[in-house]
A protein has these predicted regions:
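Positions that flank functional sites
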Residues: 35-36, 159, 209-210
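Short, solvent-exposed alpha-helical surface patches in well-structured domains
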Residues: 90-93, 189, 202
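A late-sequence structural motif
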Residues: 197-198, 202-203
Length: 222
């Protein structure tokens, strides 16, 4: 069975799917797609023009959460959703928090302004947006710390899709050195646990032309 993932290395939604595929030990061919310059083939696969897109034989799956839910149901080994229905609801809530709130308030304002505008050729960083992102990430790091106050992982005592959704966003911001790892030892320890997982290796190897990763980015010991 051929798995093919159309992705962009600094797309947090692509990263989330890559983490799930790797954690479930599913081999996949990665195809880097400059989604802002979509090819006709790419638009045929997803008229919305967004990554990630997962192709499995003749089936096409779009949107990261739909893909992740499919993979969880299709490949139940190495589960990333708890059995308890209330716990599953909490996982989904946290996934949505990072996919929506963190992405809009932090990722777009920091990664979007500082790197993606240059890559896309759409102008210069807006300092107002960058300042807002730098302000909001403090709130989100504190929220992660609050979640970890009485939990081993973000949604409970086992690692779940919630952790991968959060780590996908945080890793993109870490690529541009905009995460204050001294703000919370609990957050740093949580990220270190995820960072050390074999599933994370391909993300740590990502290189963006013109934007070298910081030295600590791939350092498992920070």
């Amino acid at each position: 069975m051929m798995h093919r993932l159309y992705h962009y290395p600094l797309s947090p939604f692509s990263r989330k799917v890559r983490l799930v595929l790797a954690e479930k030990k599913i081999e996949v061919e990665l195809i880097e797609e400059r989604y802002w310059e979509p090819s006709p083939e790419f638009l045929r696969l997803n008229p919305a023009g967004r990554v990630p897109i997962l192709r499995i034989n003749n089936y096409t799956f779009c949107e990261s959460n739909s893909i992740c839910e499919y993979l969880e149901e299709k490949y139940p080994d190495y589960p990333l959703m708890p059995n308890n229905v209330e716990e599953r609801a909490e996982v989904r809530r946290i996934v949505n928090w990072f996919d929506d709130s963190f992405y809009k308030e932090v990722t777009l304002n920091l990664l979007g302004e500082r790197i993606m505008k240059k890559i896309k050729g759409t102008g210069y960083p807006d300092s107002k947006n960058v300042k807002e992102g730098a302000k909001r990430i403090k709130f989100h790091l504190d929220y992660i710390a609050d979640l970890l106050d009485n939990r081993r992982w973000l949604a409970g005592n086992t690692m779940s899709m919630a952790d991968f959704s959060a780590a996908a966003q945080v890793s993109c911001i870490d690529y541009i050195s905009d995460v204050d790892w001294n703000r919370s030892s609990a957050v740093k320890d949580w990220y270190a646990k995820i960072k050390c997982r074999p599933a994370f290796r391909s993300l740590l190897a990502d290189q963006i032309s013109g934007f070298p990763q910081p030295q600590h980015y791939s350092d498992l010991d920070f």
